[in-house]
């Protein structure tokens, strides 16, 4: 199994990068979808606070790599898979341990651009409780508390998303083509 992981702070462009992978015919697994599905299963509203709580509980009860393990359940070992949203060093280590080839890419976007993008995308769990800037700071702090900094430090490559959407999509496409050939 070849795993290409995307790591980056909220609003950095991981979903756009994953869309490019899908367009290229690469299977994409979104780690946040595991948390959102578990929150739905528990009957919780789709808020950032609830998703954070569920993520915390899964990591506490099933181990730091719980979400990583869940997101690969039932996938073929022959596939190339993009994993969107790696958030900790434990998740990085899990993917390294199960993949024949593992590539970790940091998606970096300056904070002010992330804030604008989050405000524009309108996802239900982005902000339901007041000032978006404060909400993003809280979310960043929570994700850094999960070990996001360690995961970012483990990335072998950084793609800067400080350009137009088309330019960013092209940067992602070129990197994915290269990694799928290696």
From Swiss-Prot:
Q: Which organism is it from?
A: Methanothrix thermoacetophila (strain DSM 6194 / JCM 14653 / NBRC 101360 / PT)
Under SUPFAM superfamilies, the record lists: P-loop containing nucleoside triphosphate hydrolases
Pfam assignment, any one:
AAA_17
Entry keyword GTP-binding: no
List residues binding ATP.
8-15
Protein's UniProt name: UPF0200 protein Mthe_1012
Gene Ontology molecular-function annotations: ATP binding
Family per UniProt? Belongs to the UPF0200 family.
Q: Which HAMAP family match?
A: UPF0200 (MF_01111)
Question: Coiled-coil intervals in this record?
Answer: none
InterPro entries from the UniProt entry:
NTP_hydrolase-rel, P-loop_NTPase
Q: Which domain of life is it from?
A: Archaea
Alphabetized UniProt keyword annotations: ATP-binding, Nucleotide-binding
What taxonomic ancestry is recorded? Archaea, Methanobacteriati, Methanobacteriota, Stenosarchaea group, Methanomicrobia
